[in-house]
């Protein structure tokens, strides 16, 4: 009999949780992230059985491996999935587009907010609704409620809001760094009028500050218990789970020649918080045929440095002596590498110093490099113990040397490339100039991925098929796109006419509601005020603005 899937914290403890409890809890009380007790096996005939399935049908097949029917009956799970993806504009949900010989882009931005976060957050929103409705069924008092608190560098916030707006028994607070999201991203969040939505601009902050506030609130046992906090950031396992699906979907959309036995396939993923690419790693471990996953970072390059050196460093101890050759590759002329603080770049969703989901991979790396002695439970305990040591050192010193054995273990599945701002703009121009596969306007994060793909292809077999994840519609990042394509060689380019969808144009002039606060105490005070007001709308700053 197959072992029923449960979930445990990366940082220790013998307790395991059901899928429902792991989703509703989000972050473990000890600060760890929930991961499955085992990675399940695919059906032997999955390549033929799943070929031709729609995205919702494929989602059901994959998610069923991680969600027991005792937690969500099969028909209910399919209904949740169908509702989650009913608002996507593409029949394929996440279609691929050919951009070169053996090169494809996986467009993940056909959901309601035009960003890849919709894939996971539409699903997570439906999960929250389903679990709370079931728990509150037949109750007339003491109804269970969820206070969702999340941080965003732009796209997570709007996707979470659209996934949770007007859902009963849920109040959502989205924190973002004041002045450091694009006008369209802020408009998508702040123009939603639903009474359960609160957009919180944290003054004098960056994304890491906002994310740190969220983690602190979740780690505060009393505050968490009082308000029943729920997580929508990629620390929530359900988000990783939903994202696994589009790696399989992309595979099945490839020409048959690219899917034959022995064919080489690589995915390239613009990477900030490590959730998107971690989903690809789980897909690989499940059995999806691929060589490596390419981590594409911008100038906030802590991940690229880890895969190159084995050191995970967030402080100013890292000063690299670049030769002329490495400077040319890394684009040092576009600014010093990020070490002591987050650098604002043209790809802001990747402007992250510490990647929260990297902890999940570190657990598996600890497990792999600890040796094979002991029972499964003993090996798990040793891995958790080692991970705790790493995280304690990182918290204390701002850096941790994970060792050459860990770096080599990671290198079996990952390769990393760092892309500068200047190279990002050049890539946007390059794809707009393309003739064979037509002009293609890409957002700056996709441009980072495409640059990394081109570099990686020079080191790989020429018959490799490449899929680069496109994480946002270019309209979401007008500043970088217009900067790249405003040159004299593109006199006919008009951003509003050529790129901006009508749905986003309609945001112009709509009333915005924003709550501006200072630091953690300001966030706490706002949540306390809202929850004590019995869900009456707490006044926000109101205003209108152009995009």
UniProtKB/Swiss-Prot annotation:
SUPFAM superfamilies: Tryptophan synthase beta subunit-like PLP-dependent enzymes
Keywords noted in UniProt: Amino-acid biosynthesis, Lyase, Pyridoxal phosphate, Threonine biosynthesis
GO molecular function annotations of the record: pyridoxal phosphate binding; threonine synthase activity
Cofactor: pyridoxal 5'-phosphate
Domain of life: Eukaryota
EC number annotated for this UniProt entry: 4.2.3.1
Pathway: Amino-acid biosynthesis; L-threonine biosynthesis; L-threonine from L-aspartate: step 5/5
List of residues binding pyridoxal 5'-phosphate: 272-274, 276, 471
N6-(pyridoxal phosphate)lysine, modified sites: 117
InterPro entries to which the protein is assigned, alphabetical: Ser/Thr_deHydtase_PyrdxlP-BS, Thr_synth_N, Thr_synth_N_sf, Thr_synthase-like, Threonine_Synthase, TrpB-like_PALP, TrpB-like_PALP_sf
A Pfam cross-reference name: Thr_synth_N
Gene Ontology process terms (BP): threonine biosynthetic process
Catalyzed chemical reaction(s): O-phospho-L-homoserine + H2O = L-threonine + phosphate
CDD domains noted in UniProt: Thr-synth_2 (cd01560)
Role summary: Catalyzes the gamma-elimination of phosphate from L-phosphohomoserine and the beta-addition of water to produce L-threonine.
Entry-linked NCBIfam families: thrC
PANTHER family for the chain: THREONINE SYNTHASE FAMILY MEMBER, THREONINE SYNTHASE-LIKE 2
Family: Belongs to the threonine synthase family.
Stated name of the protein: Threonine synthase
Source lineage: Eukaryota, Fungi, Dikarya, Basidiomycota, Agaricomycotina
Name of the gene: THR4
